[in-house]
Amino acid sequence: MKQKTTKPKKVFTQSEVDRVNHFFKKAFNFGKEKKYAEAVEYYDKVINLAPNHYIAWYNKATDLARLNKYEEAIACYNVAIKLHPTDSSYWTNKGLVLLLQREYTKAVACFDESLKLDPLNKTAKTYRALVKENQGDNKFV
């Protein structure tokens, strides 16, 4: 019987931690200044050093969506969700981007996942209800 092996987690040096934190702060501040392209660039630096940094993936996705780069945003949300599947806001924001792409069925599925994790998520509830209410009568088109 083969034994399943797992890849050991990378242990970061203090210097690497400092670099990740520096790049993350720069990215976050660029986002606050609405310099989304610059923010994405710095989130890429974070991800290059720490590929499991789910908050960097999530923030990068959000900033890509603000740049109307929806496909790239969805891909980043997918990574963030894979790394941290219990945060309902990840599913909600992915659903919102899918709405912008007129992918209503997929958006509702994301809102449903979000509501499984957090039944009180107002944003997911509101947009899910809005989509369901307007499906079929072309109010979104």
Residue ranges and their predicted role:
Residues 17-49, 66:
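Alpha-helical segment of the N-proximal tetratricopeptide repeat
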